[in-house]
Each structure stands twice: as C-alpha cells, then as structure tokens.
C-alpha cells in the first residue's frame, strides 16, 4: 500500500468516529454475553419438546424401516449376492462334513439321527450321549454301527410300509401334504388336517353327483355309485368306509342292498370329527410302530408300549374322570344319578370286571369237576418274524416289519384254522383265552381249556401242529419257544389259581404288588398300567371265553333281578320273578352269582347259541345319531320258549351337565368357588383361623403338648370318634419335617442308571435333578403325576390309581 492510500484511510476512520450513528457495533455472541440472551418461555420449552419427540419418532421409523428392509430384502432368499454367499458357505460346510465322514463313518449315523423327528431323535441321542460319556470309543462306535444304524434302516422300511402308493397319491392333493408327516403331528394339527380331508371328500361328492340330482327320478343304484366314488377316496387313505361290507359290490349277493345305510355312511365320510378320530388313531399306531422299529419299546427302554403312549392314556383317563364328575344322568321323572357312581358300578370298573371273570372261571372249574373233564394250560407265541426287539434290547435281525396288530391277526387266524380242524375231527373244548404282550409289544396267548380226558392228547397235538407250522425250521427239535402245554395237577393248584394271576395283571394288578415280572423286571401291579395302554392303543381283545353262553345275558338277568326285588318290596325273598320255572331258575342262578348253575340251566357247555334258553334282546334306538341314522341298543332279554321280550332298560336316561351351586362351592372351597381372601389362604392358616373362631365361641381344646405319656395315652383313648376324625384330619395337614442333611447314598453305577432313566423320560438328568431326588424330593412328570427315587428305583405316583 502506498503512502497516499494510508493517509486516505486514516482520514476516513476519523470522519466516521466523529458521528455516533456511524460507529462500529458490538458483535452478538450469546456464549460470551449471556446476560443479553432472551429469557426462556413456556412456548419455547414446548417447541423444544416437540422437536425432541419428532427426532425420536424419526429415529424409530428409520430403525423400523431398516428392520423391514433387512428382513424382506437383505436376506439370503431376496438378495442374490447374499444368497450366493450363503450357498457357498453351505456348500463348503457340506464338503467339509463329507470329507470328515469319509474318515469317520460314525458321523454319518449321527447326522441321520439328528435328521429324524424329535420323537425319534431325542431318545436316541440321549442313549448315544450316554454311551459317549462312558469313555470307551470302541464300544461307542460298535453301538452306533450295530444298534443305531440297523434301527434307522428299519425305521425307513416301516415308513415305506405305512405310506402306501394310494396314500401318497392322496397326499399330493392341495392341502393334504400333511398326511406324509402324520406321525409327527399334534392333536391340533391332526384336527386341522381332518377338516381338510373332510373338505376334499365333500368336493369328491360334488364331482360325483354332477347333474345327477337335477331331476326327481333318481334310482337307488345311481346313489350307490355316488357312494362308491367317495368310498374309493376313503379307501385310498387306508380307512374302511362305514357300512362298506354291506354296500360294496358282490357277485353272489344273497340279500338285497341296504340302501338305507348310504346317508349315514356319507355323513360320516364328510364329517371332520369322524376323520379326526380315524386319523388320530392312525397317527398313534404309526408313531408307536416307528418307536418299536428303533427299539424304544422293550424291556431296556419302555416295556409293552412307549412311555409317551402311557402318558397319553393317563391324561385321557384323567379327562374322563373329570367328565364323569361334571355330568349326571336325568330321567323323565326328574330323578338324577351321579355319572361317576354309575360308571364305578358298571363293568367298566376294573374291580367288578375282575370279579366277574374270576367267578366265571370258577364256574367253569366246577362244571369240569362235575363232568370229569381235565384242565390244560397252553401258551402260544408268534414266530420270531413278528418280534421287533431281542431280550437284550437290540434289533431282531429276523423281524419283517410286522406290527402288533398283525401279530394279533396271525394268532386269530391260526386259532380259527385250528378250531375248524378240531370240529372236523369231532373234538370239543371250552375255556378262556388271555392275550398278553411281550416286552416289545408282540402278542402271545395263554389258554385255560377244559376237555375230555380221552381227547387231551389229540387236541394238544393238533394245537401244537397249527402253532408251529409257520417258520418251522427256526425251532428245530425244541418247540417250547412257540408252544407250551401243561396239564393242571389238582395237588399243585386249581385251574382258577393258574389263571388268576394272568387275569389280575392284565386288568389292575390287584394283589400282585410284591411280584416282579421275569420279563421286564418291574412289579406286576406297575405293569398293569402299561398293559392297559397297550391293549387300548392296538385294539387287542385281552379276554375271550368260548364254549359257554354269553355273559351279556347274565348281566341283564342280574339287572332284572335287582329291579324285581325293588318292585316286590315286602314280598317273601326268593319269590319267583318269571312265570316260566325254567327261565326263573336261570334268573335265580344269575342273581346268586353262580356261573356254574347259570351255564347248566342255559343248556350247558359246548351247546350252540341257538339252543340257549335266554338271550340278549336288542332294539333300534328311537333318537337318531349325529349322522342321522338310528343305532342299536340293548332292550332286555328274550327266550325262544316264551312269548315277547322283557325290558330291562325301560327308563330313558339323559346325560346333562351338573349345575354349579355357588354357595356350596364356597363352602367346599372347590375349584368353582369365587376367589376371596378367605379361600385363598393356605390350609394351615384356615385351620388356625377356624381354631381361633371356635375358641372365641367357647370351644376350648385341651393342650396336649404339656401332657406326659400316660396322660396323653388316657386322653387319646377317651376321645370320641368325631374328635378322633378331626384330629386325624389336622394331622394329615402337618407335613413331616425331613432332616436337612438327609440324602440317599447310591453308587456311581446307580447314579449313571438314574441319569439315564431320567433322560429316557424326557428330563435333563442334571446334577440338580439327581440331588433333588436323592434328598427325597420329587419332580412333576405331567398329568398330575410326580416321580421320586425310593429303594434304588425311580417310581411314579398316580393319584387316580385307587379310583380304578
């Protein structure tokens, strides 16, 4: 800058400073001079809060948008680049696993086990982990190759046999692909699937009808052709349509076609509830056969039937009891009967069922003594191709994927062929047959038969011939594994004593708590629950009498005798009830409970049914079922030597739900009682409060804590029955105190067995659970049950058992 410029600028500054309005202004800086900042107002604070809320909402929307974008666009199924990267990772991982499997074939078996459904893979992996924890690599590898691998191969064969070609074709329809995984489904899933199947059948019916019903002149044969179309679809699902035998085409039909059965049959095939029952039964059977294929039903795992099936049976029984307790029977006159009492008084009660069967066997024994017949005890077993598991828990190499039902059908067919040959040879017998399961669920029979002494050898030889004729080469000279016979010696025991144990252990195990099964190693009373679950699941008839009159007429006669006794009132006991003396003698024998007299008065043993004097009468039910048809029910009794029928079910009872009395529920403090501060207290507090109330009312109890032994003894013996009951009720509420240091002592081997059994039942088998059981605690196992460890055994209590 030149000198002239500097002089000019200085002159300008001096001129500007001479005027106040032209002076420099101070810069605005709120951080340096806060005193001049405008004060905050309520409006400014509100604006600030709104701005912060808007900022938070904007951040939330951006985060949500990123989540939606990542979920639906930036994933392996949407983004091609990421999908390709994930596929490369999976391919490299599969190549690595394949290379490892080339050097270690055991990993292939483990991968196959993990690929199975949970009801198969979980118990198998628990067993594999147990063998792996033993620290014996060779035994672990041998177990995988010799036990697990054959089990998986058998499982695939079972699945192929279950899923027939027609069944797979039905699963190819839209919405019915769940049929392929039917054993893996739960009840809710089966219900949804049954609805879809019923809808498919409805569409098949619409397609079959077409324009058939456009006119009124439809012939019955055309309707039957429509039924055949729907029935063919039902048969593809391996389900027999209702009334199939009566309505199917036959070459030599002797009777006219019952066209009246078509509406009820079609209504069932179009009903979702009917399909649910069929599919659920099929699901349970298929699932059980798959568990048998992998050796999970045996003496080493769960005898007779799987543990899952036992738990399902317990839950079903609990629901049935709740249903019986919540309903009652009402007749036209307004009389009511408690449904639980009616069920317990019928033959559904295991105790009554056992007593009736023992009385019948005793009657056969008395008749045999009177006739001079001998008694023989037979045992018949299926060939080895029906047995899935060996006694050591390993797969049976000769098993041909035969099911439990097929083993039962084999014995039924063999017995029918033998009976035909026996009658052709002029031989006769009578007795009772008991069906029992082996440890793997395969059926075998025990027979108590009475026959003439001169026919015993011929009948035994003929029965042995039919029992061992299939797969004869596997027996050699020893036919004992397939057929056994024992002549009952009266010196050792009566025929009733021989069969008593088999009847009891297949019903409720009464009187067999101390006996241990040689096949399973468990108490026969505990095995009874498993046997009942086995018979219910596979629909096996456990008991069958032959050669004697029917027992249903015996029950109807006893019912008639009870009704007559109530109507006679003050008349002389033993007065005749029926006009015909022969029929009245049969009724008197049934009323007295003497099966021997009842059988002989009916005509005796080995008499055809058409010659029995009293038979059961049936009638068509007046009220239609849910499917529009009328079923058949028991009417009473009838006799060919007397006119008319005698009704034993004249009163019509209707099942209704019980009405809940709120005041009574509050007094009983049951489940229906309203939740108040009174019934919500623990039992001990309620007891103490009741004691205080009674003390306030003047009811003073003697303090027994200050008495010595003699005074306490005299006081307890001087109490009335009511006071004793009250004291016993109070003592039940006092829980016994267990020592803090209490713990059962077991060996390491017993601890490993306990852990293994806990894992087999679906528990973790951790140290915490083991210590809890050893200290006397219990673990809930479902359906109101708890497991505990006592006497070196893992036991399970059942609070419903004493009701059955």
UniProtKB/Swiss-Prot annotation:
Pfam families: Phage_GPA
GO biological process: DNA replication
Active site: 498 (o-(5'-phospho-dna)-tyrosine intermediate), 502 (o-(5'-phospho-dna)-tyrosine intermediate)
Key words of the record: DNA replication, Endonuclease, Hydrolase, Nuclease
EC number, UniProt record: 3.1.-.-
UniProt GO MF annotations: endonuclease activity
Transmembrane regions: none
Function (record text): Possible endonuclease which induces a single-strand cut and initiates DNA replication.
Recorded family membership: Belongs to the phage GPA family.
Name of this protein: Probable replication endonuclease from prophage-like region
Organism whose genome encodes this protein: Escherichia coli O6:H1 (strain CFT073 / ATCC 700928 / UPEC)
